[in-house]
Amino acid sequence: MTHLKGFDLLALGFMTFALFLGAGNIIFPPSAGMAAGEHVWSAAFGFLLTGVGLPLLTVVALARVGGGIGRLTQPIGRRAGVAFAIAVYLAIGPLFATPRTAVVSFEMGVAPFTGDGGVPLLIYTVAYFSVVLFLVLNPGRLVDRVGKVITPVLLSALLVLGGAAIFAPAGEIGSSSGEYQSAPLVQGFLQGYLTMDTLGALVFGIVIATAIRDRGISDSRLVTRYSMIAGVIAATGLSLVYLALFYLGATSQGIAGDAQNGVQILTAYVQQTFGVSGSLLLAVVITLACLTTAVGLITACGEFFSDLLPVSYKTVVIVFSLFSLLVANQGLTQLISLSVPVLVGLYPLAIVLIALSLFDRLWVSAPRVFVPVMIVALLFGIVDGLGAAKLNGWVPDVFAKLPLADQSLGWLLPVSIALVLAVVCDRLLGKPREAVA
């Protein structure tokens, strides 16, 4: 096959959409929509800029270099690049995100029917990771199995939920609260940033590229083109889901005004609108959303570590699936306390890496720009990580006084200054001298 047919390309886009749509993507927008109230659309637009825009730019950046994070990190050197990639894959994979998909889907989709006991959780997670392992053992079939089978079911459930939210709202749009009253666009922008979907996009790039190549596409330009199209399809789907869920939250103050999170808002809405069957609908949405995300994460880790280490893809995915199963049943709380600071610390590095890569044609010497700017991002990533670990006493007060520091964006101004200085030096120094043989 030299080109993807329209249906195959759509299935690729559906697969990409399903990889990104985790439980958190469904849970958060309703709570943000409820807080935004009459400013719901301004907040939703700000949320889309970062919650959808940043992951889409990441997919584009990865597509331009062939799908692998290793190519993106070349300007900072092999050792630093490999260290960064390992940290991202482990933190977003078996140490945190993958086990969490199983626990969240159990607590939201199954526990209401079975209870929260250890035995139901064990039975569920064994079945859950068995399905995950079945799907990931043959990554070349992901488009067929996820894009053509699982995602249409997920989309159908989302259409029912989203359609009901729009055409059968629980009430009128409520009033805004908190910071959404004065700056809804900015608040939505910041909350979209805090979803950290950019880290997921970094690891999913290789899954998308591999799925395309496994369809017989060998032309690198076509791989890039199809990856970008898949990213656009996924971004469109995510945007529609987010908008519907924002509206659901904004119109649910009458039935869930005291809700503490999106789970309670969604539960209140589906039970009022659909009755007992609403809980089943929500269970299907959450379980399939978590399942497809877990499949993407395990597949990405398998592709990366089998290429990095002298072990087979099959061995990696089996080991990571078993490890995730164990963590989901007994070690999640402790690993979350360790992994969340790592994720927060890696996020500035990931965003800076993507931004510099997208504008790589502007740099005379990429390493002269990448290295100093990434070092500054690393410094402030460590600061944010310490803050997430509740170790603020280790951080000098000056960091807390930076603009947007309370929103985990204290790194933005220093990194911008470092970028300007690096670009000026890059232009002044000119082209690097070529080595003489």
Curated annotation (Swiss-Prot):
Q: Which Pfam families match?
A: Branch_AA_trans
Please provide, in alphabetical order, the Gene Ontology terms of the cellular component aspect for this entry.
plasma membrane
Q: Which residues cross the membrane?
A: 9-29, 43-63, 80-100, 117-137, 149-169, 192-212, 228-248, 280-300, 308-328, 335-355, 369-389, 404-424
Alphabetized GO MF terms: L-isoleucine transmembrane transporter activity; L-leucine transmembrane transporter activity; L-valine transmembrane transporter activity
**Membrane-protein topology:** Multi-pass membrane protein
Reading the lineage from the top rank, the first entry is Bacteria
Q: What is its main location?
A: membrane
* Entry annotated with the keyword Cell inner membrane: yes
Family that this chain belongs to: Belongs to the branched chain amino acid transporter family.
In UniProt terms, what function does this protein have? Component of the LIV-II transport system for branched-chain amino acids. BraB is specific for isoleucine, leucine and valine. The LIV-II transport system is coupled to sodium and lithium ions.
Can you name this protein? Answer: Branched-chain amino acid transport system 2 carrier protein
In its UniProt entry, the species of origin is given as Pseudomonas aeruginosa (strain ATCC 15692 / DSM 22644 / CIP 104116 / JCM 14847 / LMG 12228 / 1C / PRS 101 / PAO1)
Q: Please state the gene responsible for encoding this protein.
A: braB
